[in-house]
UniProtKB/Swiss-Prot annotation:
GO terms for molecular function: metal ion binding; metalloendopeptidase activity. It comes from Bos taurus (Bovine). It holds the Pfam family Peptidase_M3. Hydrolyzes oligopeptides such as neurotensin, bradykinin and dynorphin A. Acts as a regulator of cannabinoid signaling pathway by mediating degradation of hemopressin, an antagonist peptide of the cannabinoid receptor CNR1. This is Neurolysin, mitochondrial.
């Protein structure tokens, strides 16, 4: 998942809050109110600070609002006939960079700080700044000057990226309703402010959730000793199991006690149920009403207009077609799982209920992998200590993309476990950016896996380039005494995926902050990172990523062959579940009268063939709904069509570590950032229109 500092200028929500904003900022002549910010705006520097106290966060938030508002006010009073490219468009870009960087220091700590008071202050700053963003985004005086500039300037005389910036600015202004009557604008503004707060609260609730369950050792049957020994014990000699990924998934995949899995699945899918259900009941109608006032049939239609899919009709057709193609495969996989369950219930003396329950799915899919391919993930993870995986991952990316990474000593970070690296072009030595690695869970930390864009890589007023900065935030298991953190293969894949987002953020070289890094269409943003997941299914790459944590021996060829062969295991059910989530997301954003829990239950039964557990409400735990993927979750599958096409037609054909193909990918897919449309970048790379052939093959389906 990608969480960008620049989602604001795309008019999307982001994890932790919404920045629904067309940032109409101002020019060089009026920069004096922001001189206090200018001291840290320097080329080739990471200017971010992570030591702000709650009081400083609050003070700097108000200062940022005051200073920025003065700039907006000044441009709003400018005689419209005096508006030029230099004093308006270029000036917008200059101020935008400063605002983004300062804002990042104020709102990012809510996701990663170890201090609860800092997280709370950061969350409040995000809410306060989001309200301010909306106010500024809906200033008609600024919008009219942008429109005037577009109508009067010679577009052919400005650079293509500047022309795109101008056209997108006008488009975003209209998508904010600035062409509508004042009364309608005020309605939209009020609703957007409320939506922003709801999104922030939705994900804050999930991040702060500290639910845990208590089990005896017998109730954790079949779980490995190293996992059980890592758990905190209660006074009654039982074990605490949290709902964080490093606890939840091992239990769901390996615990042989159905009742334990049932309790865990029930708790996991009722996290924040009461409060987040209420939030969704408020948020979804607000989105629909804003879309209606802007002239769209539904919120999904509103957001899809800016994506490569363009319409709900195209998305529905894509999901329904894929669902039908996968139906036979899903049925076969369910039948196999049901037979496994029947056999195990007989052997262990459990009651066999004749169906696959939600808490059975991960467990029996793991057994399927072990039986069909002899892949034991517990044995396998001993070859993936996190230090070895990290070193191998960094080496592969450096070699593939022509980069060099250097760890920064004594780096300024938000937690002692976080590391910082500088990225340089290997050929020229030019510094491109920096990235943080925040790998382990902490109380209150963002509880999924994501790349956060923190500092945009773009041009500064003096023509020099600001380096891009990103953070990879994941939650792998903590190291134990005498044993490093060991990763499951699916965690290695997650690591590669999210680091692909980091490379997109770092390698993009754009003029404008608005187009920097991963600031592309939402249904294209996953393409680069998904494409790079293929490396964790390549035997040679896996050798570079692995070494036994105790004796340092390489992973055996036999184990490698089995792992690579297992790529297609459970692919039908896994893809059908993605379709379920995509359909739920589309449904909730096309018909607000629907009940989220009921809609999820309906599609689980109809498409996945595994009923949702009564009493749960998975959508209330679905952070994507409030994190920038509203109406756009389909993008994960949609993007895979493109990513698989790129991999099989170029990398697989020419060699996955071929440096020429790697540089072509870096230059044609990563470097443009959002300065080109996603489909144009794809066609430049493929030299043809993309097709579904490779994607269908990757799912074990016949290609047309």
């Amino acid at each position: 998942m990608i969480v960008q500092c620049l989602l604001a200028v795309r008019g999307l929500h982001r994890v932790g809050g919404s920045r629904i904003l067309f940032r109409m900022t101002l020019g060089r002549e009026e920069m004096s109110p922001l001189q206090a910010m200018s001291s840290y705006m320097a080329a080739g520097r990471n200017v971010l600070r992570w030591d702000l106290s709650p009081e400083q966060i609050k003070t700097r938030t108000e200062e940022l609002i005051s200073q920025t508002k003065q700039v907006y006010d000044a441009i709003g009073m400018r005689d419209i006939k005096e508006v030029t490219y230099e004093n308006c468009l270029q000036a917008l870009a200059d101020i935008e960079v400063k605002y983004i960087v300062e804002r990042t220091m104020l709102d990012f700590p809510q996701h990663v700080s170890s201090d609860k008071e800092v997280r709370a202050a950061s969350t409040e700053a995000d809410k306060r700044l989001s309200r301010f963003d909306i106010e500024m985004s809906m200033r008609q005086d600024i919008f009219l000057r942008i429109v005037h500039l577009k109508e009067t300037c010679d577009l052919e005389k400005i650079k293509p990226e500047a022309r795109r910036y101008l056209e997108k600015s006008v488009k975003m202004g209209k998508r904010n309703g600035l062409h509508l009557p004042e009364q309608v604008q005020n309605e939209i503004k009020a609703m957007k402010k409320r939506m922003s707060e709801l999104c922030i609260d939705f994900n804050k609730n999930l991040n702060e959730d500290d639910t845990f369950l208590v089990f005896s050792k017998a109730e954790l049957g079949a779980l490995p000793d190293d996992f059980i020994n890592s758990l905190e014990k209660t006074d009654g000699d039982k074990y605490k199991i949290t709902l964080k990924y490093p606890h939840y998934f091992p239990v769901m995949k390996k615990c042989c006690v159905p009742e334990t899995r049932r309790k865990m699945e029930m708790a996991f899918n009722t996290r924040c149920k009461e409060e987040n259900t209420v939030i969704l009941q408020q948020l979804l109608p607000l989105r629909a009403e804003v879309a209606r006032l802007l002239g769209y049939s539904t919120h999904a239609d509103f957001v899809l207009e800016m994506n490569t899919a363009k319409s709900t009709r195209h998305v529905t057709a894509f999901l329904d077609d894929l669902s039908q193609k996968l139906k036979p495969l899903g049925e076969a996989e369910r039948e196999f799982i049901l037979n496994l369950k029947k056999k195990e219930c007989k052997e262990r003396g459990f009651e066999y209920d004749g169906k696959i329950n939600a808490w059975d799915l991960h467990y029996y899919m793991t057994q399927t992998e072990e039986l069909k391919y002899s892949v034991d993930q517990e044995t396998l993870k001993e070859y993936f200590p996190i230090e070895v995986v990290t070193e191998g991952l960094l080496n592969i990316y450096q070699e593939l993309l022509g980069l060099s990474f250097e760890q920064v000593t004594d780096a300024h970070v938000w937690n002692k476990s976080v590391t910082l690296y500088t990225v340089k072009d290997k050929a020229t030595g030019e510094v491109l950016g920096q990235f943080y690695l925040d790998l382990y869970p902490r109380e209150g930390k963002y509880n999924h896996a994501a790349c956060f864009g923190l500092q945009p890589g773009c041009l500064l007023p003096d023509g020099s380039r600001m380096m891009s900065v990103a953070a990879l935030v994941v939650n792998f298991s903590q190291p134990l005494a005498g044993r490093p953190s060991l990763l499951r293969h699916d965690e290695v894949r997650t690591y590669f995926h999210e680091f692909g987002h980091v490379m997109h953020q770092i390698c993009a070289q754009t003029d404008f902050a608005r187009f920097s890094g991963t600031n592309v269409e939402t249904d294209f943003v996953e393409v680069p990172s998904q494409m790079l997941e293929n490396w964790v299914w390549d035997a040679d790459s896996l050798r570079r990523l692995s070494k036994h944590y105790r004796h340092g021996s390489p992973i055996t060829d036999d184990l490698l062959e089995k792992l690579v062969a297992s790529r297609l295991v459970n692919t039908g059910l896994l893809t059908l579940r993605q379709i379920v989530l995509s359909k739920v997301d589309q449904s909730l954003h096309t018909n607000t009268a629907l009940d989220a829990a009921s809609e999820y239950a309906k599609y689980c039964t109809e498409i996945l063939g595994v009923a949702a557990t009564p009493g749960t409400n998975m959508p209330a735990t679905f952070g994507h709904l409030a994190g920038g993927y509203d109406g756009q979750y389909y993008g994960y599958l949609w993007s895979e069509v493109f990513s698989m096409d790129m991999f099989y037609s170029c990398f697989k054909k020419e060699g996955i570590m071929n440096p020429e193909v790697g540089m072509k990918y870096r230059n044609l897919i990563l470097k443009p950032g959002g300065s080109l449309d996603g489909m144009d970048m794809l066609q430049n790379f493929l030299t043809r229109e993309p097709n579904q052939k490779a994607f269908l093959m990757s799912r074990g389906l016949p290609a047309p």
